[in-house]
């Protein structure tokens, strides 16, 4: 396992981020992985139910601090925080926490970045221009050199299911027109590359989901399978990827089907998210593939409805931390 800590950006201060980070530290403080939080130290202490917090100035200090206190690179929120009430006034700090984490990961000071949940609406009100975390991280890392196909490609992992998305934060009504053969090929290449490099699968098998019911019924229910998806599958095969499909999505996620592939390429957001959350609602992990840094996050949102009540579960964040550490170790960072 890498000796460098992970970084965790604290997410929206009005949500459950600080609470689940404190709970994750309690669960991992003795056996790791070690991490340093980028956020508001005072908020983390209060949200964590009295958890001991220690401000650090460098990530390298985290290893010594971690068994006894939660190490924090303290960047305070500059406006009042009310749990459950997100505010555009928090946007500068939220963005700075993410930017700081990316900078530390790119410099090698940390082994990877785990991001606590953010809410898009208050960020948009403050002028944020990206559909979500994934696209913002791609922009922040765009100048970094990287070998092979690059992302961002969103993967959701739960148990033995690893599902990647061709269209990410796209309205369902717009997803069909957003599909292109080139996008499917790139997502497939990035996924196959990640399965080899990050998950240790020497010869990954990739299933490709159809868009339409019954894979389009030979064009009767839509031509996307014929005109867009099938050509992408053929191109992936020609490029050396063990790809199969397009297959009807309702046949791809039962246990026997999952045994026949190592990753599944989904055409739109909920085609991947629904089976992942059905399989493991509490423990799913979001991984951004195709970046020059390791990035994971919990597979849930900000939890404004339960923020400040002390009942948020840290399972998904813990899984995200553990998976980020495993990927970093495989990459040797």
UniProtKB/Swiss-Prot annotation:
Record-listed E.C. numbers: 1.1.1.262
Catalytic activity: 4-(phosphooxy)-L-threonine + NAD(+) = 3-amino-2-oxopropyl phosphate + CO2 + NADH
UniProt-annotated location(s): Cytoplasm
UniProt-listed GO biological process terms: pyridoxal phosphate biosynthetic process; pyridoxine biosynthetic process
Pfam families for this protein: PdxA (PF04166)
Domain of life per record: Bacteria
Note: The active site is located at the dimer interface.
Subunit-structure text: Homodimer.
Name of protein: 4-hydroxythreonine-4-phosphate dehydrogenase
Natural source organism: Caulobacter vibrioides (strain ATCC 19089 / CIP 103742 / CB 15)
């Amino acid at each position: 396992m890498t000796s460098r800590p992970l970084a965790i950006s604290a997410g929206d201060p009005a949500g459950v981020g600080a609470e689940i980070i404190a709970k994750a530290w309690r669960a991992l403080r003795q056996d790791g992985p070690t991490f340093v939080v980028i956020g508001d130290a005072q908020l983390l202490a209060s949200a964590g139910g009295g958890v001991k917090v220690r401000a650090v100035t460098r990530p390298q200090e985290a290893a010594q601090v971690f068994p006894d206190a939660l190490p924090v690179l303290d960047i305070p929120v500059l406006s009042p925080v009310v749990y459950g009430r997100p505010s555009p006034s928090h946007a500068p700090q939220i963005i700075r926490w993410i930017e700081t984490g990316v900078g530390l990961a790119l410099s090698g000071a940390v082994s990877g970045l785990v991001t606590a949940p953010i809410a898009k609406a208050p960020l948009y009100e403050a002028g944020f221009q990206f559909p979500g975390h994934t696209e913002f991280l791609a922009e922040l890392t765009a100048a970094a050199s990287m070998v092979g196909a690059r992302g961002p490609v969103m993967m959701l992992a739960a148990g033995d299911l690893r599902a990647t998305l061709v269209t990410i934060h796209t309205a369902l009504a717009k997803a069909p027109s957003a599909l292109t053969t080139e996008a499917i090929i790139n997502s497939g290449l990035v996924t196959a590359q990640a399965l080899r490099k990050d998950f240790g699968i020497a010869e990954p098998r990739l299933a490709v989901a159809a868009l339409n019911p019954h894979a389009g019924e030979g064009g009767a229910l839509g031509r996307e399978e014929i005109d867009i998806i099938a050509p992408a599958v053929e191109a992936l095969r020609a490029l050396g990827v063990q790809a199969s499909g397009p297959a009807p999505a309702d046949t791809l996620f039962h246990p026997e089907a999952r045994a026949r592939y190592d990753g599944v390429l989904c055409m739109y957001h909920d085609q991947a998210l629904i089976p992942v959350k059905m399989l493991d609602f509490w423990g799913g992990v979001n991984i951004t593939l195709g970046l020059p840094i390791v990035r994971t996050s919990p597979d849930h949102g900000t939890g404004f409805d339960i923020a400040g009540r002390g009942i948020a579960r840290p399972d998904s964040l813990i899984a995200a931390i553990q998976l980020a550490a495993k990927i970093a170790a495989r990459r040797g960072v």
